[in-house]
Every structure is written in C-alpha cells, then in structure tokens.
Amino acid sequence: MVKAVTVLSGSGGVSGVIHFTQEEDGPTTVTGKLSGLAPGLHGFHVHALGDTTNGCLSTGPHYNPANKEHGAPEDETRHAGDLGNVTVGEDGTAEFTIVDKQIPLIGSGSIIGRAVVVHADPDDLGKGGHELSKSTGNAGGRLACGFIGLQG
C-alpha cells in the first residue's frame, strides 16, 4: 500500500489534513478533515503543481493529464483532479472520504508532488453555464492548499 498526506493551510484560519491511500492498481481513497470554512459546499481539487511559493495561486490549474473539460467526479469527461465538493457543517468543519480511480499515487499520472486546493465557492461540476464552468467549475478563490507528499 502507498500512502500520501497533505497538510492544508490558507487564509482566514482555514486548515486541514488529507490522507491518501492506494492498494496496487486499485482506486485511491482520500480521507480528510478541514476546519475554518464557511458552512456549505466548497470545490475540492488536485491541482497540477505542488508549488506553493506564491500561496495557492502558484499551484497551477486542475490536474488534467488527459486534457479534458471540467466535470463531476462521476463524469467520464472531467479533469483527473476534479473531486467535486466537500460539505462543511455549521461548525465550519468537514470530514469526508472520497474513492477515485483517476488520482493514482503510483505509476503513470501519480499525484505525488502536486497540490490539493479547497475553494471558496461550490464547484458547479461543469454544468453551471458560467464562462468558467468548463475550466474551473466556477469554484471561486483558493482558500487553502497543500503539497501532496509521500508518507511512510
């Protein structure tokens, strides 16, 4: 089994820890806990770069090795890094588990060394009709991010 971890930090006290696990050629399981967010839905994506030298702005676009349009996690046409939304409760926290086969930790297309980003607004899953729907899901600003690193 391969494991990875991301420690998220950002503006306004947003923080969290995300764990990734993958068994051989199986899907990747993502578990996380976030805090300091406004209640509601927040876009949650793997971005192409692990560079946080300019905060979350330097993490690049959504991870998209197949050069597809933005979509929902269950859509055939989507960026590999499109993980949809996390639901934040009234207390400002979110706990979640996502299982996804497009974000491997091993082999071709590994997400190790890339970044996770939590956005200010809901991801419209490419279906909102906004000019940004097909590229970013119109998910708004980048509130918190972190580098995806290999874990022992």
Curated annotation (Swiss-Prot):
Top EC class for this record: oxidoreductase
- Cofactor, free-text remark: Binds 1 copper ion per subunit. Binds 1 zinc ion per subunit.
Which Pfam families is this protein grouped with?
Answer: Sod_Cu
Q: Which Gene3D superfamilies match?
A: Superoxide dismutase, copper/zinc binding domain
MF terms from GO for this chain are: copper ion binding; superoxide dismutase activity
Describe its assembly: Homodimer.
Q: What is this protein called?
A: Superoxide dismutase [Cu-Zn]
Species assigned in the record: Panax ginseng
